[in-house]
Amino acid sequence: LKGMYGDCDYIDISYLLNEGKIFQYYHQGKIFLKKWFNSDKKNVVVCYTKVEFWDYPIIRYAYSLGYKIVYDQVETDYNTKGTNNSIKTKIHFLLTGKVSRRAYKWSDGSFVISEALKEQNLKAYPPQKMCILPNSTPILEKTKKQFFSNPPTILYSGTFAKKDGVEYLLKAFLLVQKKGYSCRLIMTGKGQPSDMKVLELVKDNPDVQYKGMVSDRELVETLLDCDILTMTRENSKFSNYGFPFKLSESLATGNPVIATNVSDVGKYVKHMESVYLVQPECVEEIANGIIYYLENPQNALQIGQNGLNVMKKHFSIEGVGKKFIDFLVNI
């Protein structure tokens, strides 16, 4: 797979790894790194959070040619509580973690997705340059919503690992119904078979619809059609060192959002202004957020519009892209 994306020349040689041709993978990687190197310009290799041991030699080769090496870190330890990985995956992440930490020591800088991740890196690698770079998203809103559906629809979209706090949302939804409010819950996404057992909490509830995995097009349509969007998380190291990509995606719809206050979420959005902010693992607060939106639909819609403005300010493709380029130019 190769071609041009905008002004970017790209090639994908990962198929060589999938075919077990690791030496050919190294050979091809070195050829293109040498071909693309321009001694009259700044040359940068941007690497993903985890450094796989088979990629380490190629990154070292790029460094020896004169490339600046920068990492894009979006998480901390992938084996932290709540990730529910298999033994095989845990061993793999343990090994890549060791390789990654070794690689970070001689890198030129890193993009990090949260303040906590920045502080963690600065303690471990003091000379390294850091840039907090949130994820970006396109604007999804097409027309400004004027009113809620009847009955209003709540959406959860994402994975179903313990870290995602789906259990608290389901219990909150049941509590809202118990208090006499009429609403529906739609869920999309997927998790490990053991994670999906959480749906047993609502297996006999006619107002809950689990759609499973959906296409990108259907996901956007569902995000726009639903009235209240939710982003839940547990209070875990994984949650507080990473950043929930679903937040910006939800804000981009212009619909009201209930968001768990983990990581840097509270630095971007304000409670009752651009989202309804709840503490992690708190059923009562999630229920109160749903009830507030149900009882105050016009206020909810305004909060959704304010959230869209936050997305445009902090998570737009243009804004995040400029921050990305500026850091690389000045590294």
Spans of features found by a protein language model:
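Nucleotide-sugar-dependent
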Residues: D164, R217-T222, D227-S248, A259-K267
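Glycosyltransferase donor-sugar binding loop
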Residues: S157, R184-K197, G212
